[in-house]
Amino acid sequence: MATQRASGLLQRLAQGSLVKQILVGLVLGILLAWISKPAAEAVGLLGTLFVGALKAVAPVLVLMLVMASIANHQHGQKTNIRPILFLYLLGTFSAALAAVVFSFAFPSTLHLSSSAQDIVPPSGIVEVLRGLLMSMVSNPIDALLNANYIGILVWAVGLGFALRHGNETTKNLVNDMSNAVTFMVKLVIRFAPIGIFGLVSSTLATTGFSTLWGYAHLLVVLIGCMLLVALVVNPLLVFWKIRRNPYPLVFACLRESGVYAFFTRSSAANIPVNMALCEKLNLDRDTYSVSIPLGATINMAGAAITITVLTLAAVHTLGVPVDLPTALLLSVVASLCACGASGVAGGSLLLIPLACNMFGIPNDIAMQVVAVGFIIGVLQDSCETALNSSTDVLFTAAACQAEDERLANNALRS
């Protein structure tokens, strides 16, 4: 009986809500740091192990996901997807730009176990570009060992295009390997509550409860930027497309897609909800049946915001100077990173080291930033997914309605 009860408890823990478990880990970590500082410092090992597991799996994850995605790409998508695809990419880049502006206006400070003396910052945009180019020609094994994400991306894209000409058995093998790595990532992330318990306990024990205010400020910047994009930037893009008041459509998408996505925390899981909303809005089925799954893959405004804000928070904490051209380049890199963040729990967080590489921030410190992202992830990930998923429907509806009006006007003229 005792064994059955224990196995039942483990099953509930494994299949339970990760959000609730992370909340419990946060609360327990705060309580332990308040009750016993030595005990809180001791359980910091749990957080160290969690961050180490993330560092181990992240480079392989990026390589396999990108390679499998390109190798298994299907040709022959309809040409009327192009306006929606353009909106997706423009929206993601606009979100990254907004995040840069927010981060400079309201700089956040993180508590990292390193000082600016450990960092050799680039002197300007030329050195940043030189570093990026040199990273691109890195040996693939060396790139994986040293977490050189630029080099990993280049090899993943190159191998992906090469494997397009391979037979189906090879493509299936690559896809299966990608699924296996994704499973390992999900397994690691199931330990997030325990890791966060250790991280919060040790952080509060060593730095004090003032750290919570630093995370609160970071959350306000992140969520404030996402609200700016959802309520100002996206409506402007929709108005540019449909030339009328965009807010009825914006609020409908936030209400009927964003709310669901906030709680599911998965763009993929929200695809049926978005499909039903598109049908309710009388959109073209041939269009939204392609654009909604496509949006769940590449339309990642929330991820671009997360990557940009957390990267610039690390840069500000370490005292690394950032000029305007470098900030603009970060917006481009964050947009590209965001497009690769789909389908993985915590995907946007695991791509932060790629953006941090631009500023000479080592992988060890970048993964501490990822750990901070997991601590605030209860709200950050929910808001990010709500923005991402609701924008899928919003831009699809805007493009479809603009096309319908164009056809109607042409019919009237003729």
Curated annotation (Swiss-Prot):
Q: Does the keyword Cell inner membrane apply?
A: yes
Transmembrane annotation, as ranges: 16-36, 46-66, 84-104, 143-163, 180-200, 219-239, 300-320, 332-352
Which of UniProt's keywords are assigned here?
A: Amino-acid transport, Cell inner membrane, Cell membrane, Membrane, Symport, Transmembrane, Transmembrane helix, Transport
Gene3D superfamilies cross-referenced by the UniProt entry: Sodium:dicarboxylate symporter
Q: Cite a single GO MF annotation.
A: neutral L-amino acid:sodium symporter activity
> Which family is annotated?
Belongs to the dicarboxylate/amino acid:cation symporter (DAACS) (TC 2.A.23) family.
Q: Identify the HAMAP family for this entry.
A: Ser_Thr_transp_SstT
Q: What is this protein called?
A: Serine/threonine transporter SstT
